[in-house]
Regions:
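Conserved loop-alpha-helix segment in the C-terminal half of the alpha/beta-hydrolase fold
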Residues: 35, 207-247
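Catalytic active-site module of serine/aspartate enzymes centered on a nucleophile-bearing elbow/loop
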Residues: 236-289
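Gly/Ala-rich beta-loop-alpha elbow adjacent to hydrolase catalytic centers
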Residues: 88, 92, 96
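Residue in the alpha/beta-hydrolase core beta-strand immediately N-terminal to the catalytic nucleophile
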Residues: 47, 85, 107-109
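Flexible "cap/lid" loop of the alpha/beta hydrolase fold
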Residues: 105-142
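Conserved alpha/beta-hydrolase catalytic His-Asp/Glu region
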Residues: 145-206
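Conserved HGGG/HGGXW glycine-rich cap/lid loop of the alpha/beta-hydrolase fold
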Residues: 6-56
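Conserved acidic catalytic loop of the alpha/beta-hydrolase fold
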Residues: 66-84
Length: 289
């Protein structure tokens, strides 16, 4: 059994594999793939700063990918993680690429990474409107959320923007996933930053020297592949690209076997002989299964 607390899931042994969730999420977004990956790697899935269960986001820090990566590096240092293979989804994908620029990644699997738009192209403002609308709707349905998410057809409809098959998510997980967005303490600031269309585009990609796989969900409604993959495919040195057929923006529930296989094939191909990490004695507390 792994070590779990609200700020991190950690289990397994072998090459260190860091999993980074997206904006307004938390580490349980990776729940479908954790068991299989932890059977092959030392899996470290932190909840990002300012998110539900994660460490506080520094009050004085701007909402930028660079500042988010600063906070993430501090968290990884506290966990005793040096370099690692890094897998990120959405905002987590952008942070994975930012870590690669800093030399912290042995390899990167970026699943529908954010930050691939261009300042002024309207995508940041579109995302601001999307997240603001989602938060308003979530607040409205919060009192009835448990009842709403008890029906598979309603889960599929409610989660359609982030995945194709929301009915595969357990009701309790669907409730937790939805409530996590309301508990994201930086949501308002991040939406304002998106609306201002500054600070959340990822640049200097030529600084990346580790292997990178860009994995694009075929039916991504939040970051459509046609608009959000091209710049990364052009600017990341030696990047590999593949489509994830039949999947939405958060693809771990849509096709768990495909996501595990995609990660495992790429990471195992770029495995190193570096020793595994070891957490500080008091870094994590044991909690629930």
């Amino acid at each position: 059994m792994g070590e779990i607390d609200p700020s991190c899931y950690r289990a397994g042994a072998g090459e260190p594999l860091v999993l980074l969730h997206g904006f307004t999420g938390s580490w349980p977004h990776w729940r479908p793939v954790l068991g299989e990956l932890a059977a092959r790697y030392e899996v470290i899935a932190p909840t990002l700063a300012g998110h539900d269960g994660g460490p506080p986001y520094p009050i004085s820090a701007p909402i930028t990918l660079a500042a988010g990566a600063d906070s993430l590096e501090e968290h990884l240092d506290e966990l005793g993680v040096g370099t690692a293979h890094v897998v990120g989804n959405s905002m987590g994908g952008a942070l994975a690429l930012e870590l690669a620029k800093r030399g912290r990644a042995r390899s990167v699997v970026a699943v529908a990474p954010a930050g691939g738009w261009t300042d002024g192209d309207g995508e940041a403002r579109r995302l601001a409107r999307f997240f603001a609308r989602q938060l308003r709707l979530t607040r409205l349905i919060e009192p009835r959320l448990t009842t709403i998410m008890s029906r598979p057809s309603v889960r599929r409809a409610s989660l359609r923007d982030i995945m194709r098959h929301g009915e595969l998510v357990a009701p309790a997980d669907a409730v937790d996933m939805t409530l996590a967005s309301l508990r994201c303490t930086i949501a308002g600031r991040a939406i304002a930053t998106l609306q201002a269309d500054r600070g959340l585009t990822l640049g200097d990609l030529d600084r990346i020297t580790c292997p990178v796989l860009l994995a694009s969900p075929q039916f991504d409604r939040i970051l459509p592949v046609a608009k959000h993959a091209p710049r990364y495919r052009r600017e990341i040195p030696g990047v590999e690209w593949r489509m994830l057929p039949g999947c939405g923006h958060v693809p771990m529930w849509d096709d768990t076997r495909l996501i595990v296989g995609t990660i495992d094939e790429f990471v195992s191909r770029h495995a190193t002989d570096s020793p595994p990490t070891s957490p500080p004695a008091a870094a994590l507390s044991s909690a629930r299964d």
